[in-house]
Design a protein with these regions (language model features):
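Extracellular glycan-targeting catalytic surfaces
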Residues: 1-219
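A long, hydrophobic alpha-helical segment
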Residues: 215-229
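Long, repeat-rich segments with strong aromatic
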Residues: 231-233
Length: 233
């Protein structure tokens, strides 16, 4: 039988307050009932459309040659108008290059996490397992699938064509991972998510943390004195 899963004791969360999450999915907070209905409607569409996301579906081959490598370009870097091949890219301070979102994995990453959250909240509110099941599929396809799973590094994040294959500043692309952590904890309430898959996701993030703490790009970003350093923390 389908029933709301908010009666289950929520696990400790990283960003959100579990009691507040419970109040939201129960509809206890005035003015949020329509928002919750919209989230459930979005979850229905996500399940129906069956769209999954992966770094491997990007037409742009990263410098590593491995489609599973996350790739993005710096937001303020543009093709060089003075060279035939556009290289090296030149910086236009404060001018966002829309080409970035056409060649980068960043939009797919954000879309995946947005969908996972919608499905997770809808699952918490209704107990409808297909929501949790498709959220798990999104997570598996992005992180764990043998052919499509992202490698646990950001070697090629915010690359600058013709100058560098990746920078520490690109780590901020994955700041949204913080949002994903709470969704993963909430999905642990689903009986459809196997322990082996849960462990595999944790192993992936252990490897990612190891890269962050030891790779020169990670070390550089950790030492940053601006919003990038804060995002790293």
């Amino acid at each position: 039988d389908v029933g709301p899963s908010w009666h289950v004791t929520l696990p400790p969360l990283v960003v959100l307050n579990p009691s507040q999450v419970s109040r939201v999915v129960r509809g206890d907070i005035q003015g949020l009932s329509l928002l919750l209905e919209a989230v459930i409607d979005k979850a229905e569409k996500i399940v129906a459309q069956k769209t999954v996301y992966s770094v491997a579906t990007n037409d742009k081959v990263p410098p590593s040659g491995d489609l599973r490598s996350y790739y993005s370009t710096g937001p303020y870097w543009w093709r060089n108008p003075e060279t035939s091949d556009g290289l090296p890219y030149v910086r236009r301070d404060g001018e966002f290059n829309p080409e970035r979102d056409l060649v980068s994995d960043r939009p797919a990453l954000h879309a995946m996490i947005s969908d996972v959250w919608a499905l997770t909240i809808a699952y918490q509110a209704t107990g409808f397992e297909p929501y949790a099941l498709f959220a798990q599929r999104l997570i598996h396809f992005w992180f764990l699938d043998e052919s499509s799973g992202m490698l646990p590094d950001l070697n090629h994040a915010q690359a600058i064509p013709g100058i560098t294959e990746g920078r520490g500043t690109g780590i901020i692309d994955t700041l949204v991972f913080v949002e994903l952590v709470d969704a993963l904890r909430l999905l642990e309430n689903s009986y459809t998510w196997s322990l082996s898959e849960q462990v595999a996701v944790k192993v992936w993030f252990d490897k990612f943390l190891n890269w962050l703490s030891k790779h020169p790009n990670g070390i550089d970003e950790r030492m940053a004195k601006n919003n990038h350093g804060t995002a790293y923390d």
